[in-house]
């Protein structure tokens, strides 16, 4: 599907515009091939999931994965793509394993992934050249940081992908009742646009970006807490539904860890939840993992260094907002407490910037906060940073281009249409010059590549 989308887009947009400059007679298939390759490189994590990628020939795959401009969040995606491509027609493609692995930058993979995944892969075990590539990667990790330049080849060179312009998607929310409206903010143009509405009203949902799509998970439709999940495709400007969660959840936390979507805590209409479930896009199924130690509704979540954090919230039992924070280790499938925040926060906006966890605003009973604190997993400690310009609870949060954005929310008396962002270098918050068209709290926020 993604390859076809790239071809259609290029044929309708890029190719005709370039042809105006070259002249139709000079417009070659080489230019068309270049444009399509550029699209595939920029959207590789999405492309690698499709049958069209698996049907590419050897030279086409090598051309893609050897490029310094390939857009991937980690080299794991490239390794997984190679394994999938080989398995698609294993009998005829097995002989190409070494040629493909020559372009996978194994030294840039985490050591744990090399040991637990790469070394255990049968296709690697049965190929001497591939085993040599693995040994090279392990040697690279054994060297002190200042000596790693001694192993200098294309596999040790970090990729430098072409960055695509980003837009921010603000999904649903409460204004003052649950709404279907979805707004899109173009950072470059400083402009808000309405995009495809949700299939049904939804506020207090968990919203995340995963593998090229935006997921709206659970929430409240104005009458009931729901377990349904809708997925937004920016290329098509269209929402579709996928498998529902096991439990109804509103005011939940949602995050992505290791290509799995986690739904954390929340409120089912009668009680706060400690349960946690996760969604696999490969099987379109939800399954439970270990529950938290504390029931948490209005909880904020974030992922740092392979761990999932649940921040503050409301437990319903003590009838107090929480300052406690829990950390989930997916390998051990267990939750453990880490350092408490300095203040109780329910409905805090939680986001991750530069490897640190931010908790912005929230409330403690009737007191709505504008204070912000930051957690450093390395020191297991929280510190205060500058206050926001406005008191906010139940706001959406996202990080993009080195800034942390806090979107909407309410100040205790009215829903907010304003957005402000934090600059960690200056320790300063700045209001965006333009507001959303609708003041909304309990909206979800995600950042995606600007649809072409």
What does each model-identified segment do?
Residues 1-28, 32, 36-190, 226, ...:
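Alpha-helical scaffold in the C-terminal half of BTB/POZ domains
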Residues 142, 162-176, 196-197, 210-222, ...:
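Glycine-centered tight turns/hairpins at beta-strand boundaries that repeat
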Residues 416-452:
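Blade-level signature of beta-propeller repeat domains, shared across WD40, Kelch, NHL, RCC1
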Residues 165, 179, 202, 225-226, ...:
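A detector of repeated loop/turn-to-beta-strand junctions in beta-rich toroidal repeat architectures
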Residues 192-195, 239-243, 284-290, 332-340, ...:
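Blade-edge beta-strand/turn elements of extracellular beta-propeller
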Residues 182-188, 228-236, 274-283, 323-332, ...:
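Beta-propeller blade signature
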Residues 200, 222, 238, 247-248, ...:
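Conserved loop/turn at the beginning of each blade in beta-propeller domains
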Residues 181, 203-207, 228, 250-254, ...:
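Beta-propeller and closely related beta-sheet repeat lectin domains
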């Amino acid at each position: 599907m993604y390859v076809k989308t790239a071809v259609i887009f290029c044929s309708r947009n890029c190719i005709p515009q370039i042809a105006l400059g070259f002249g139709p007679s000079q417009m070659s298939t080489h230019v068309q091939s270049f444009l399509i390759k550029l699209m595939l490189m920029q959207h590789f994590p999405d492309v690698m999931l499709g049958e069209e990628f698996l049907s590419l020939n050897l030279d086409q795959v090598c051309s893609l994965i050897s490029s310094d401009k390939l857009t991937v969040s980690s080299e794991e995606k490239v390794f997984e793509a190679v394994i999938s491509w080989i398995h698609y027609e294993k009998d005829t493609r097995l002989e190409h394993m070494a040629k493909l692995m020559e372009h996978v930058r194994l030294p840039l993979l985490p050591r744990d992934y090399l040991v637990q995944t790469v070394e255990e892969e049968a296709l690697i075990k049965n190929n001497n050249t591939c085993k040599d590539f693995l040994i090279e990667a392990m040697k690279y990790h054994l060297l002190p940081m200042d000596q790693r330049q001694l192993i200098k080849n294309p596999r040790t060179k970090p990729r430098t992908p072409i960055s695509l312009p980003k837009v921010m998607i603000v999904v649903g929310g409460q204004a003052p009742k649950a709404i279907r409206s979805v707004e899109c903010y173009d950072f470059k143009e400083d402009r808000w646009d309405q995009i495809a509405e949700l299939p049904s009203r939804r506020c207090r949902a968990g919203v995340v970006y995963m593998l090229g799509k935006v997921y709206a998970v659970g929430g409240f439709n104005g009458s009931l807490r729901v377990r349904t999940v809708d997925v937004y495709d920016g290329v098509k400007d269209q929402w579709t539904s996928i498998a529902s969660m096991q439990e109804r959840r509103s005011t939940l936390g949602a995050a992505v860890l290791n290509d799995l979507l986690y739904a954390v805590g929340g409120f089912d209409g009668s009680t706060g939840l400690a349960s946690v479930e996760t969604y696999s896009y490969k099987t379109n199924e939800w399954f439970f993992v270990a529950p938290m130690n504390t029931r948490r509704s209005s909880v904020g979540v974030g992922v740092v260094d392979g761990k999932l954090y649940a921040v503050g919230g409301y437990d319903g039992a003590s009838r107090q907002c929480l300052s406690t924070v829990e950390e989930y280790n997916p390998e051990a499938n267990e939750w453990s407490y880490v350092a408490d925040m300095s203040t109780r926060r329910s409905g805090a906006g939680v986001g991750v910037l530069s490897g640190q966890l931010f908790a912005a605003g929230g409330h403690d009973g009737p007191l709505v906060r504008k204070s912000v604190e930051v957690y450093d997993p390395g020191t297991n400690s929280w510190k205060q940073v500058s206050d926001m310009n406005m008191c906010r609870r139940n706001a959406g949060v996202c990080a993009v281009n080195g800034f942390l954005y806090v979107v909407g929310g309410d100040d205790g008396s009215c829903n907010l249409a304003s957005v402000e962002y934090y600059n960690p270098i200056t320790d300063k918050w700045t209001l965006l010059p333009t507001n959303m068209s609708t003041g909304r709290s309990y909206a979800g926020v995600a950042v995606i590549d600007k649809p072409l």
